Amino acid sequence: MKYMKIVITVILSFLLCGCASAGAPAQIAATTLPVWEFTSRLCSGTPVTVTRLITEQVSCLHDYSLNVRQVKAAEAAETIVISGAGLEDFLDDLLANASIIDASEGIPLLCGEEQEEEHHHEEGHHHEEDPHIWLAPENAKIMSRNICDGLSARYPQYAQTFETNLSQLLNELTVLQQYGEDTLSQLKCRKLITFHDGFSYFADAFDLTIVKAVEEESGSEASARDLIELITLVEENALPAVFTETSGSSSAANIISRETGCGVCSLDMAMSGSSYFDAMYHNIDTIKEALG
C-alpha cells in the first residue's frame, strides 16, 4: 500500500509538471520599439509575454549586432516579430530557423531610386528599399493587422482578445494620422532637410517634401562641399529649420545654423525609447513649431 502511494505521488508529480509546462505563458520576442509596442498592446489581457530585443537608443541598424543577452532572448522565444522590409537583415542567421511574424507584408516600399528621384535624397548609405515603414500611421495599421493575424494563427485561444485589442490600436493610429494632417495642413513651409535618410514615409504621410536627406556615417562629418550645398539649399528654399535625429550628430546642422540663422530641431525615428506614439506626436509637434 505504501509502495502504491509512492508510485501515485510520482505519477501525479510528472502530470503536474507537464501541465505547468503546457500552461506556461508563450514567450515572444520583438525586435524594435514599434513592433514590440504593437505586439504588447495586442497581447494585453493574455498570458503571452513579449520581450523587446533592441532597447538601446538607436536610429538605424546598419552596423548593429546583438549581445549575448539579446541572442539568448531571441533563442528562447517561440515566435519573433520583425519589422521586416530588410531592417533586420543583420539577423538572417539567427532568424533562419525561427518562427517569424513579418509586420511589413503587403506594405508598398519606397526604393532608394524612387526616394532620390522624388525627394532628391543624397546618394549614400541606405537600404535598397527603405525599411522605416512605421513612420507612416497607415503603414503602422497594416503592421498591427499583420502581427494580429500572426498571433491568432499561433495562439487561436486568444484570437478574440487580439482582435479586440487591434480595434483599439487601429483607432489610436487613426487619431494619430488625423492629428498630423490637421496640425501640419497649414504650414508656411512644407520642405525639410533631414540628417537621416529614413523620414520619407513620414513625409509622404503628411504631404511634406524632403529637399535633402543627409546620412552621416558614424564618426564622420560633412565635408566642406556638403556644407556649402546644404547652406545653399537652406537659403534658396528659405528653410526656417533643419532637422537632426535624436540619436545622431548635430555638428553639421549647427554649422548650417550659424551660417544661415536657421533653427536646429530634432526628430525621432521611433526605433527606441519608450513609446512609438510619443515619438510620432513629438515629430508632428516639432515640425509644426519649426515650420509654422
Predicted regions and their residues:
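Bacterial N-terminal signal peptides
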Residues: 7-17
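Extracytoplasmic metal-acquisition and chelation regions
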Residues: 19-292
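N-terminal secretory signal peptides that target proteins for export/translocation
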Residues: 1-2
